[in-house]
């Protein structure tokens, strides 16, 4: 049995869960999220009101999907109650970020500013010219936008310049030594 998959997902007060076959819809104070669970996996509610994810047999694919499905359902519940935030920072001379309306405008050493538009359900906040955060209720969207922004100027292994997650340790390389 999957150790993660067999744990029930607790549903806090103020969260409404609707299960219709393979579709799970979670509505909470921050919004609504939907998920379609893969075919052999079943989702139901137990007597305590918690969400239980079960699998029909112990085939390898079903074992893999069991833990995954439980985690995805848990992420829905966390998203509509607390939301997700990724904090990022910029290192480098002249590298900065500013908020233009609901979009982020980056100066990353290119000949032009780079503008990232906020997709639906994602909000940007700028704490300083070198620190900003990405928030939303969908964990996948927040992570994907964060990765896309980091890819604009990956941290350089020699000088450490670029966009990185807050607290991320960059493996530094030693430069060439002169004679």
Curated annotation (Swiss-Prot):
Name of this protein: Large ribosomal subunit protein uL6
Ribonucleoprotein keyword on record: yes
GO BP term, pick one: cytoplasmic translation
GO molecular function: rRNA binding; structural constituent of ribosome
Family according to the record: Belongs to the universal ribosomal protein uL6 family.
One of the record's GO cellular component terms: cytosolic large ribosomal subunit
Record's subunit section: Part of the 50S ribosomal subunit.
Keywords: Ribonucleoprotein, Ribosomal protein, RNA-binding, rRNA-binding
Protein origin, superkingdom: Bacteria
Function per UniProt: This protein binds to the 23S rRNA, and is important in its secondary structure. It is located near the subunit interface in the base of the L7/L12 stalk, and near the tRNA binding site of the peptidyltransferase center.
InterPro entries tied to this protein: Ribosomal_uL6-like, Ribosomal_uL6-like_a/b-dom_sf, Ribosomal_uL6_a/b-dom, Ribosomal_uL6_bac-type, Ribosomal_uL6_CS
Tagged with keyword Ribosomal protein: yes
């Amino acid at each position: 049995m999957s150790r993660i998959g067999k744990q029930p997902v607790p549903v806090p007060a103020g969260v409404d869960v609707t299960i219709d076959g393979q579709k799970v819809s979670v509505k909470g104070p921050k919004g609504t999220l939907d998920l379609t669970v893969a075919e052999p996996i079943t989702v139901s509610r137990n007597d305590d009101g918690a969400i239980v994810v079960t699998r029909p047999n112990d085939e390898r694919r079903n074992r893999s999907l069991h833990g995954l499905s439980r985690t995805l359902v848990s992420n829905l519940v966390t998203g509509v109650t607390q939301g997700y935030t990724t904090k990022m920072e910029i290192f480098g001379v002249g590298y900065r970020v500013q908020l233009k309306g609901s979009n982020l405008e980056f100066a990353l050493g290119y000949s032009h500013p780079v503008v990232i538009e906020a997709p639906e359900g994602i909000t940007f906040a700028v704490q300083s010219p070198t620190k900003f955060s990405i928030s939303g209720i969908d964990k996948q969207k927040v992570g994907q936008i964060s990765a896309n922004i980091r890819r604009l100027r990956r941290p350089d292994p020699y000088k450490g310049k670029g966009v990185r997650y807050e607290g991320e340790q960059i493996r530094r390389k030693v430069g060439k030594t002169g004679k």
